[in-house]
């Protein structure tokens, strides 16, 4: 189950990396970030005279160009002038910096670059030995690319909302599919980054638990010697120790008691307290001893009287 989950996570990471990079590249390279009504201005020289034609038409713009969709200049695109001559920037320095950042488009370009390196790390993780360290690098690249992307989107929205040169000419505007491609790229990049970091953390925990268990096993086996070695060690220690053959303190105590001292522990009987039972017991003991003493004598006499047991000497 874990292998299946890990395979799904790697699939999500690979597909997401490709999708995020493709969407952001298309968004940066196309001119459909914003639809608005504006004036298409063009210059034409005829007979050393410059004629200006101003016409309010529907336009679509990207990060660097604006193209006309209607009127006499339909299909004509021109470079966006973020610093027109009639604009006064000395009164508002923040707006000037915003226009400079908007003109450079540094954050969208940085996002594309980070997504590219993140995709390379994901591809390298399939072949590199330390794949999990490469996956961690990919996660960092994707998270950074997403942050750069969202900063660029915020700067773009702020620049369009606070553009004094087009505030009067623009009556309505809406964001195009290039803008939404960039937004989707941000979401996918963050998801891929989180999944990549999760893969690294999970694998790192598994490796740490495995190494900890192996270390415990090694330490346990190192402390306990083999059975044969322990058995030999015990037998050798028993044979070499001089005290092992000595008697225990309890047995020493029993064996050291002399036979002469036994009388000290015997209890004397009072002859006045002798009963009939004690007299019968004494008679039985006397009869038993008499029979025991007489039996060997009778047995010896039978052996001597038996002619089969007599020794015969040859004549």
UniProtKB/Swiss-Prot annotation:
One of its GO terms (molecular function) is PDZ domain binding. Residues 232-253 are annotated as: Disordered. One of its GO terms (biological process) is transmission of nerve impulse. The L-type calcium channel is composed of five subunits: alpha-1, alpha-2/delta, beta and gamma. Acts as an auxiliary subunit for AMPA-selective glutamate receptors (AMPARs). Found in a complex with GRIA1, GRIA2, GRIA3, GRIA4, CNIH2, CNIH3, CACNG2, CACNG4, CACNG5, CACNG7 and CACNG8. Interacts with AP4M1 and GRIA1; associates GRIA1 with the adaptor protein complex 4 (AP-4) to target GRIA1 to the somatodendritic compartment of neurons. Keywords: Calcium, Calcium channel, Calcium transport, Ion channel, Ion transport, Membrane, Phosphoprotein, Transmembrane, Transmembrane helix, Transport, Voltage-gated channel. It is a multi-pass membrane protein. The lineage of its organism: Eukaryota, Metazoa, Chordata, Craniata, Vertebrata. Regulates the trafficking to the somatodendritic compartment and gating properties of AMPA-selective glutamate receptors (AMPARs). Promotes their targeting to the cell membrane and synapses and modulates their gating properties by slowing their rates of activation, deactivation and desensitization. Does not show subunit-specific AMPA receptor regulation and regulates all AMPAR subunits. Thought to stabilize the calcium channel in an inactivated (closed) state. The modification Phosphoserine is found at residue 248. It is found in: Membrane. The chain crosses the membrane at residues 8-28, 104-124, 135-155, 181-201. It comes from the Eukaryota. Belongs to the PMP-22/EMP/MP20 family. CACNG subfamily. It holds the Pfam family PMP22_Claudin. GO terms for cellular component: AMPA glutamate receptor complex; dendrite; excitatory synapse; glutamatergic synapse; postsynaptic density membrane; Schaffer collateral - CA1 synapse; somatodendritic compartment. This is Voltage-dependent calcium channel gamma-3 subunit. InterPro entries: CACNG_subunit, PMP22/EMP/MP20/Claudin, VDCC_gsu.
């Amino acid at each position: 189950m874990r292998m299946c989950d890990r395979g799904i996570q790697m699939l999500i990471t690979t597909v997401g990396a490709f999708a995020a990079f493709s969407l952001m590249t298309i968004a940066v390279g196309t001119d459909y970030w914003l639809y608005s009504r504006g004036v298409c201005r063009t210059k034409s020289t005829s007979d050393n005279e410059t004629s200006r034609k101003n016409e309010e038409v529907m336009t679509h713009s990207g990060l660097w160009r604006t193209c006309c969709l209607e009127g006499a200049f339909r299909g004509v695109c021109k470079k966006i002038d973020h610093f027109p001559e009639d604009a006064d920037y000395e009164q508002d320095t923040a707006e000037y910096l915003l226009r400079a950042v908007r003109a450079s488009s540094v954050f969208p370009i940085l996002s594309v670059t980070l997504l590219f390196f993140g995709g390379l790390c994901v591809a390298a993780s399939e072949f590199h030995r330390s794949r999990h360290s490469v996956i961690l690098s990919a996660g960092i690249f994707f998270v950074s690319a997403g942050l750069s992307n969202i900063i660029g989107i915020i700067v773009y929205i702020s620049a369009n909302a606070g553009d004094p040169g087009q505030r009067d000419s623009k009556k309505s505007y809406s964001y195009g599919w290039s803008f939404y491609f960039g937004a989707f790229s941000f979401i996918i990049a963050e998801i891929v980054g989180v999944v990549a970091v999760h893969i690294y953390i999970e694998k790192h925990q598994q490796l740490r638990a495995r190494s900890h268990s192996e270390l415990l096993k090694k330490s346990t086996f190192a402390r306990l010697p083999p059975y044969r070695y322990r058995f030999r060690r015990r037998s050798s220690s028993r044979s070499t120790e001089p005290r092992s053959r000595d008697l225990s303190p309890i047995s020493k105590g029993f064996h050291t008691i002399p036979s002469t001292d036994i009388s000290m522990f015997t209890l004397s009987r009072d002859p006045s307290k002798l009963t009939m039972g004690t007299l019968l017991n004494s008679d039985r003991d006397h009869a038993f001893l008499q029979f025991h003493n007489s039996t060997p004598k009778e047995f010896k006499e039978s052996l001597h009287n038996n002619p089969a047991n007599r020794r015969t000497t040859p004549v």
